Amino acid sequence: MGIIIGLIIVSVALIISLCSLLYILTSKSQKVLNEKKIKEAKNERKKILSDTYREINEQKKSFEENLQFEKNKLEIAKQNIENENNLLIKERAIIIKQQEAIDVKNTDLDKRIKNYSDKREELIKRLEIISNMTSFEAKAELMKNVESKIQYEIVSQIKQAENLAHARAKELSNNIILSAMERFKTDIVNEKTTNLVKLPNDDIKGWIIGKDGRNLKTFEQLAGVEIIVDDTPEVVTISSFNPIRREIATKTLEKLLIDKRIQPIKIEKELKVQEKLIDETILEIGYQVMDELGIHDMDKELVKLVGKLKYRTSYGQNVLLHSVEVAKIASSIASELGLNAKQALRAGLLHDIGKAIDFEKTGSHVFLGVEVARKYGEDEVIINSIEAHHEDVAKESEIAVIVAIADAISASKPGARNNSIEDFIVRMKEIEKIGNSIPGISKTYAFQAGRQIRVIVDPVTTDDKDLAGILETLKNDLKNSVIIPGEITITAIREKREILVFN
């Protein structure tokens, strides 16, 4: 028991000794560690202080350099200000001297003005004594003389300016017109009233005439033309002042000759076919003209009337070619003057559009042209250009004036017009117009310069006993209205057909 207690005591003592030793060792290790950390902290502190001192020194150096730079700038600016100030002082001194000189001159000028005024007053008084006129009267007389002289000079200058302006305007207008005429050229097509149809041989003439002349009479009656079958070999002449009727008849006869079937029924049928074809041709011609001139917004009916002008002549001049030429000349002049060239082109093309229908309707070509232009939506400038190109009304725009000038240029070209043919056509139209105005007559055709007249009477409203009265009325009307040289023959045709169709 005592041993155990002794062992326990020894063990406890040993444990205590070990703990003491461990504590001592631990304390020493901690102390060494702390001393190391303190040393490292001191080194870090020294490094931080060193870096801080270095950075402060660098900033201080930079600041001192900047400060010195700013000081230098201030010194330079100060020097510049001093220089400018010195310059201003010198300039001010110069200005003061100049002002003093001006003051001296002004003083001298005032003295001279006063002397001049005194002398002027003295001179006026002496003049009043010499001339027995007051200064007001003398001034009025002087003004009168000056005004008279100035007025004369002004009138002379105005007259000179007007002469120069007229000369310049004439030269300019001549250049514009010459330029327009040189730019466009239109062939002159002489008017004719006959077409020649070539035959394969002279035996065909018998076919054309037909039994007892039936084919020839039917053809002439339905076509409204005269067919001349004479001794000219292998040729038949179709005569009519109406170019469309003449063209339809020519095409019909040529087609019948190809088919080799010439008889009244075939003639009537082929005439209707050719009438339809000529209408299509007229429209095609109209659209060709529109393409040539660059017009793409014209009413179809107006386009058709333009095409119809190809078959119309005036004083021997083809109206379509004339209208196209007028359009181009008017467009060129308008372009030179800075006006609406497209509007001038359109107005020039349509200025004679009434001639496409004046042989079908009553009225002048101007009146009819205005009527159709307004009907198919042309604007007032175009309408006035049509209405005014023969001076029937006043021209309301520059375009109307240009169209009238272009029309005159085209018409006045050498060889462009033939008055004798135009007079002949006017006479033939008048004969047909008089005949168609008589009640009972449905169609009138004039041939051989009006010496041969064929009238077709309405078989429903007239009978055979009325023919003599109708012819007498026509004869008297023609005598009173138209001068026709030579002997006149009037043939009246009354034909009634009755067709019965049954099963």
Swiss-Prot record:
Which SUPFAM superfamilies is this protein grouped with? Eukaryotic type KH-domain (KH-domain type I), HD-domain/PDEase-like
- Domain of life per record: Bacteria
Where does the UniProt annotation locate this protein?
Answer: Cell membrane
Q: List UniProt keywords, sorted A-Z.
A: Cell membrane, Endonuclease, Hydrolase, Membrane, Nuclease, RNA-binding, Transmembrane, Transmembrane helix
Where are its TM segments located?
Answer: 2-22
Q: Which PROSITE patterns match?
A: HD (PS51831), KH_TYPE_1 (PS50084)
Q: A GO biological process this protein is involved in?
A: mRNA catabolic process
Question: What SMART domains does this protein's entry cite?
Answer: HDc, KH
Of the GO CC terms on this record, one is: plasma membrane
> What Gene Ontology molecular-function terms does this entry list?
RNA binding; RNA endonuclease activity
Topology relative to the lipid bilayer, per the entry, is: Single-pass membrane protein
Return the CDD domains for the record.
Answer: HDc, KH-I_RNaseY
Q: Give all cystine bridges in this chain.
A: none
HD domain span: 319-412
Return the InterPro entries for the record: HD/PDEase_dom, HD_domain, HDIG_dom, KH_dom, KH_dom_type_1, KH_dom_type_1_sf, Ribonuclease_Y, RNase_Y_N
Q: What is its EC number?
A: 3.1.-.-
User: Per the annotation, which location comes first and is thus the protein's main one?
Assistant: membrane
Boundaries of every KH domain copy? 193-253
Q: Which family does it belong to?
A: Belongs to the RNase Y family.
Query: What is known about what this protein does?
Result: Endoribonuclease that initiates mRNA decay.
Q: Sorted alphabetically, which HAMAP family does this protein's record hold?
A: RNase_Y (MF_00335)
Q: What is this protein called?
A: Ribonuclease Y
- Which species is listed as the source? Mesoplasma florum (strain ATCC 33453 / NBRC 100688 / NCTC 11704 / L1) (Acholeplasma florum)
Q: List the taxonomic lineage.
A: Bacteria, Bacillati, Mycoplasmatota, Mollicutes, Entomoplasmatales
